[in-house]
Amino acid sequence: MARYTGADCKRCRREKTKLFLKGSKCDTPKCPIEIRPYPPGEHGRGRTKDSEYLLQKREKQKCARIYGILEKQFRGYYDEANRRAGKTGDELLKILESRLDNVVYRGGFAPSRDAARQAVRHGHVQVNGRKVDIPSYRISENDIVEIAPKARELTPFIVARETAGQGRAVPAWLESIPSQMRILVHSLPARQVIDTQVQEQLIVELYSK
């Protein structure tokens, strides 16, 4: 599957906000957006007034980059959200949050969504006792997500277990049990508990044209 292979920090600078793509580095003064809070490139410091279309496009790109998704798959998620009964923007974020790689990240077992995606692809994650190696797999209410027993002594998961509770908070719709390397999915998230900083209405406006 195609994926972005460029510099993560340039993506944050391009969007002029932290996308939290580099794990704990994003919370330190070494984060490049703290040092150079302007877009990369020769004209990055220039001041431009974005058009309505560009604002919508940038918001879509920001959201896709946060979750590590390319355009074709992102558009597919939007089309699915648009067919649902609720607000399209809300439903889009619910779909993105229900991805397995996101749940591993949200549960604190990976420092970034990219690291979570790699853990899933390498076969280190189980859902309800069965190995799942597809990052886009959708979790459901009452699912149990856990790190496979053979993988629990790998360095990334030892670090996750030993530093549990020291970083970002686990959202209320999940329960993380670091001692068992397990995440309980109590429910699927409502929009008001999703802390992703995007204006989803701009995405809806872009795709509605």
From Swiss-Prot:
Protein name per its UniProtKB record: Small ribosomal subunit protein uS4
HAMAP family: Ribosomal_uS4_B
Entry-linked PROSITE patterns: S4
GO biological processes: ribosomal small subunit biogenesis; translation
Subunit structure: Part of the 30S ribosomal subunit. Contacts protein S5. The interaction surface between S4 and S5 is involved in control of translational fidelity.
Gene field: rpsD
Protein family according to the UniProt entry: Belongs to the universal ribosomal protein uS4 family.
Primary role: One of the primary rRNA binding proteins, it binds directly to 16S rRNA where it nucleates assembly of the body of the 30S subunit.
GO cellular component, one term: small ribosomal subunit
Pfam family, one: Ribosomal_S4
One term of GO molecular function: structural constituent of ribosome
KW Repressor (keyword) present: no
SUPFAM superfamilies per record: Alpha-L RNA-binding motif
Domain of life: Bacteria
PANTHER family listed in its UniProt record: 30S 40S RIBOSOMAL PROTEIN, SMALL RIBOSOMAL SUBUNIT PROTEIN US4M
UniProt keyword list: Ribonucleoprotein, Ribosomal protein, RNA-binding, rRNA-binding
